[in-house]
Amino acid sequence: MADDSGTENEGSGCTGWFMVEAIVQHPTGTQISDDEDEEVEDSGYDMVDFIDDSNITHNSLEAQALFNRQEADTHYATVQDLKRKYLGSPYVSPINTIAEAVESEISPRLDAIKLTRQPKKVKRRLFQTRELTDSGYGYSEVEAGTGTQVEKHGVPENGGDGQEKDTGRDIEGEEHTEAEAPTNSVREHAGTAGILELLKCKDLRAALLGKFKECFGLSFIDLIRPFKSDKTTCLDWVVAGFGIHHSISEAFQKLIEPLSLYAHIQWLTNAWGMVLLVLLRFKVNKSRSTVARTLATLLNIPENQMLIEPPKIQSGVAALYWFRTGISNASTVIGEAPEWITRQTVIEHGLADSQFKLTEMVQWAYDNDICEESEIAFEYAQRGDFDSNARAFLNSNMQAKYVKDCATMCRHYKHAEMRKMSIKQWIKHRGSKIEGTGNWKPIVQFLRHQNIEFIPFLTKFKLWLHGTPKKNCIAIVGPPDTGKSYFCMSLISFLGGTVISHVNSSSHFWLQPLVDAKVALLDDATQPCWIYMDTYMRNLLDGNPMSIDRKHKALTLIKCPPLLVTSNIDITKEDKYKYLHTRVTTFTFPNPFPFDRNGNAVYELSNTNWKCFFERLSSSLDIQDSEDEEDGSNSQAFRCVPGTVVRTL
C-alpha cells in the first residue's frame, strides 16, 4: 500500500485527513460598492411607515384642497407674467388685443393652435381677433358703446338654391351661437377690428385728423400752419399724439419741462387710449423730424401716430383758443405765454396794432442806414414780434407799396443830408460809424513800397479831396497785381463813394451815379475809356458844372465829385492824351503787392486804418475841427416822426 500523502513521521503529531470549508461572500467579478456597508444585514425596519395607511380626516381634506388651489393660482400668475413679458407689442398700449392681432398676423400657424372649442361662426370670418383676459385693462364705456359688429351676414352671389338653403341654415346656427356668446366679447372684437382697420388704412393722417376733431371739437388745421419740409426749423410747435399709455401722462410734464420755455398740455381719453395736445416753445429752433424723435422717445409711441405742425401765430381765433384753454382746469401750463398769444388776446395790444404809420418805418430805415427795398422789407418784417407798427405793416395788404415808398423817402433824406455836408463833415460823419481806432502806418508804408513820396502825395491828395478844379481827378496807373484797385476800393469804402464802369458807356445813363455821390471811382480804365474821357469829359474833369442825363428824369446840372481812376495805361507817356495831362494827377504803382506765407496782405488797408489816417493827418488835409466844433455839433438828429406832447397832471 502506497504512502498516504501528507503523512510523514506518523505518530509525532496530527495525522490523517481533515476537512477545510471556505466561506465565499462575493462571487468572482462582483463589484463592491464603496458607499454602502455590505456587511449590514437588512432587517426590514427601514421600510416601516413608507405608505401612509392612516385614516383621512375631514380637516386634512380641506387643507389639501386649499394647498392645491394656491399652487394652481401661483402657476397661473407665473404663466400670465411670462405672457406679458414675451407676447407684448413693442409699444405699450391700452388696446391690448392689438398685440395678439399682430401675433396672429406674424404667425398664422401659431394662431391656429386652440385649446378651447371655437364656435362655427369663426370659420366664416376672414380675420379673427382674440381677447386678452389677462391684460389688466378693461374696456371703457366709450368702447362698449361705439362697438360695431365686424361682419355682416349675407348670401354669396355665386351660390345656387341649394347653397342658399345651406347658407340660411348656417346663418341660423350662427345666430344661436352668437346668442350664447357674451355681449362684451363681441363688442371688444368689433372695437379691435376697427382699430386694426384704422392702422391699415392708406391715409393715416386723415384718420388722425378725424379723431382729433372728434375728441377736441375743432379741426387741427385751425390751430396750425402746415410746413411741407421736415427740415424747416421753428421755435413753436403744436403736437397731437394718439394711443399713449396712461402712466406717461403723469410724468410728461416733468419730462418736457427741461426742454421747453413754454408748454400748454391737454390730455383726453378715448377708445384708443390717452390723446395729447400740446403747444411747445423750445429753447432753440427745432425741425419737425427732431421734434418727432424727441416726443416719440418721451411718449413711447411711433412717430406716425403724431401730428406735428407749427402754430398759426397770425390767427386771432387760434390765439384765443390757447388763451381760454390755458386759464381753464383742462390744461396744464408751464412758463410764460408766447408774445403772439398775448398780442392778440390783450386789448391794449390789439388797439396798438390797428393803424400803420409810414413815418415810423421811414425813421427806422433812416436810423439803420437801409435804403434797399428788399432789405427794408426783410428786416422790418423781423420786428413784427415786438414792434406794433411792424405788426400793422405785416397785416396790411399794401406791403409792397409801403416798402417802395419807404426806400424812396430814405434815399431822399440821405441824399439831402450828404449834399448839405462839406467834405470835412462828411469824413467825420463816416468815421463816426466805424468802431475802433486802427493804425495809419500801413497806408504810409504801402505808399513807400510803391516808391511814392508821402509829402507830395499828401499835397495832391488834399487838393483832390476838396475838389479843386483841374485837380479833382487822380489816376493810379501801373502793371497788374500792384494793388491799385485794392488801394482805391478801400478808400472809396471808407468815404461811402460810388463806383462807375465804362462797360455801360453805350447807355446814356452810365454817369448817373455821380449825381448821388460824394466821391467816385472808375476802375480799370482801358484805351476806349480814356478816349471817351478825352472826347466828352474834359469839362467834367475841370471841376465845372456839367449836365447829366438821368433815366426817367430831367437833365441835372452837377459838379463832378472827386474821381479816382485805376488803369494799366500811363496817359502821361502818350501824346494823344495831352489834353488830359493837366486835368488828371497820376501816380504810378510799379511794385507787386506783397503777401505773407499764409496769403494775407502785408499792408492792411481797412476802414479803421483809413479812419486813423484821416484823424492823424486832419491838419495836413485841412479837415480838422474848428474851435466852435470841438465841443460837438449843435445840430439836432434828423427826425421824420412827429413829436408828442406829454401832458402832466
From Swiss-Prot:
The keyword ATP-binding applies. It catalyses: Couples ATP hydrolysis with the unwinding of duplex DNA by translocating in the 3'-5' direction; ATP + H2O = ADP + phosphate + H(+). It holds the Pfam family PPV_E1_C. A motif (Nuclear export signal) lies at residues 106-115. A motif (Nuclear localization signal) lies at residues 83-85. Residues 138-169 are annotated as: Disordered. There is a cross-link at residue 559 (Glycyl lysine isopeptide (Lys-Gly) (interchain with G-Cter in SUMO)). ATP binds at residues 478-485. SUPFAM superfamilies: Origin of replication-binding domain, RBD-like, P-loop containing nucleoside triphosphate hydrolases. The keyword 4Fe-4S does not apply. InterPro entries: Helicase_SF3_DNA-vir, P-loop_NTPase, PPV_DNA_helicase_E1_C, PPV_DNA_helicase_E1_N, PPV_E1_DBD, PPV_E1_DBD_sf, Rep_E1_papillomaV, Znf_lg_T-Ag_D1_dom_sf. GO terms for cellular component: host cell nucleus. Residues 452-602 form the SF3 helicase domain. GO terms for molecular function: ATP binding; ATP hydrolysis activity; DNA binding; DNA helicase activity. It is found in: Host nucleus. GO terms for biological process: DNA replication. Its EC number is 5.6.2.4. Phosphorylated. Keywords: ATP-binding, DNA replication, DNA-binding, Early protein, Helicase, Host nucleus, Hydrolase, Isomerase, Isopeptide bond, Nucleotide-binding, Phosphoprotein, Ubl conjugation. The modification Phosphoserine is found at residues 89, 93, 107. Transmembrane segments: none annotated. Can form hexamers. Interacts with E2 protein; this interaction increases E1 DNA binding specificity. Interacts with host DNA polymerase subunit POLA2. Interacts with host single stranded DNA-binding protein RPA1. Interacts with host TOP1; this interaction stimulates the enzymatic activity of TOP1. Belongs to the papillomaviridae E1 protein family. ATP-dependent DNA 3'-5' helicase required for initiation of viral DNA replication. It forms a complex with the viral E2 protein. The E1-E2 complex binds to the replication origin which contains binding sites for both proteins. During the initial step, a dimer of E1 interacts with a dimer of protein E2 leading to a complex that binds the viral origin of replication with high specificity. Then, a second dimer of E1 displaces the E2 dimer in an ATP-dependent manner to form the E1 tetramer. This is Replication protein E1.
